[in-house]
Amino acid sequence: MLEALLRDITATEIIAFARAVQTEASYALTGNVMPERQINGVKYKTRRTSRRVNAAKYRAYDAQTPIASREVKQIETEGQLPPLGQKYLVGELETILLAVRRGQDASELVEMLFDDVAAHTKSIRSRLELAVGDLLTDGKFTLTGENGLTVEYDAQVPSANMPTAATPWTDPTSDPIADEMAWLETLRASGAPMPEKVLTSYQARALLSGNDAYRAAYYGSVNPSNTPTATLAPNEVDAVRARYNLPPVEIYDVQIPKDDGTMARPLPVDRWIMVPPNRTQWGETQYGITAESIALTTGDNPAIELEEAPGIIVTHGWQDDPVQVWTKGSAVAMPVLYVPDIHITAKVF
């Protein structure tokens, strides 16, 4: 009976539907900070090359051109992408089957299946949003006993790129302008490009409005006693940042529900992240090939083509004892940082 009810639902349709599910618009980390990329394998690989090119030397006319030296250093890291996913059993199945036997069609069952397919996709993307936040926070992606899996990927981010504010920004007498200027100097010293934007919480951004250094900069005060004490408006804070050529601030306050009923923030509320431009050269969220996708690309009538194998895969099936219909979402994926020293993740309070 189950086979007859589900015979019109193909693996091809389910996967196409799953991959058409839109990512949450607020998921900036996997959306544009470390964007998603599909790779044809199960291993991530990063390659960093640094080349030192010395200045040329003048020579006398008719003298031999000197032979220059060069210094090239290449660091290559690879590892296995970890699997993730989940399985749903269709709820209230007995009620649905009884309704079908009374002459109704299987549309309710089909609708529930596709609802679960969408939920699998969103769940996997939510976990990867948390993973990117984990990597950005301390330079490491860490799993500790998650379904028996323990993994640590260390991107080797220098400690200078993970500073702490000289004085917590919750103190109105702190100097966030001086802090950010120092962090920009750290980036310049390593040859990093100017950050495109700052990613932080509303709470951290709001601290600038009541900060003495920002007020003094806005009003052009030399003596603190002459500085108005009014809280700055957002556009006034932006004016100060523009004056010092500081990158624009983007608010990121995403919270993701966990299966224990709590909410998790991908990024701690106290982090101030300076994000570089050209981010596909900095880091990505890599999706590889799952065992399920390999199975779907084989046989006389494959459900998907080989080039479609990387990414999120959702499969479905049924059994008679006990009577169950299930869907399963799968992926092998994690964030990978290619260049560890062109961003700043600062703790500001």
Name what the model sees in each region:
Residues 215-349:
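Sequence/fold signature of self-assembling virion shell proteins
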Residues 180-238:
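Ordered core of a single globular domain
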Residues 31-100:
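Assembly/oligomerization interface modules of large self-assembling protein complexes
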Residues 160-162, 306:
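Short acidic (Asp/Glu) and glycine-rich catalytic loops that position anionic groups and cofactors
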Residues 163, 167-178:
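A surface/extracellular/periplasmic glyco- and lipid-processing/surface-interacting theme
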Residues 82-158, 175, 179-180, 185-206, ...:
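Long, contiguous amphipathic alpha-helices that act as assembly "spine/axial" helices in icosahedral shell
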Residues 1-42, 336-349:
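N-terminal alpha-helical "arm" segments
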